[in-house]
Amino acid sequence: MKKIEYSGVCDMNGELIPYGAPLDFTWWAMGMGGEVELHLVAKIRKRKSGDIFEFIKDDRGRDCHFTHRLTSLNWCSDDLELLK
């Protein structure tokens, strides 16, 4: 049985997030009409140089791929929800 390794980050419900688990990442962006709430699917990946968010689906459910360091984005636990 594979051991689950946790990232040390909690989601909006206080649950620890395992590495590689899909998350609903709420991203707040500025649009023409003001603030827009986008929901992207991301995973947390472990890297020697620091953990990253790996985004795998955009707000329309289309496949995408881009990464950001956890420390380079303005986010909080309320922006993350573990997808079951």
What are these regions (language model features)?
Residues 1-84:
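Secondary-structure transition motif
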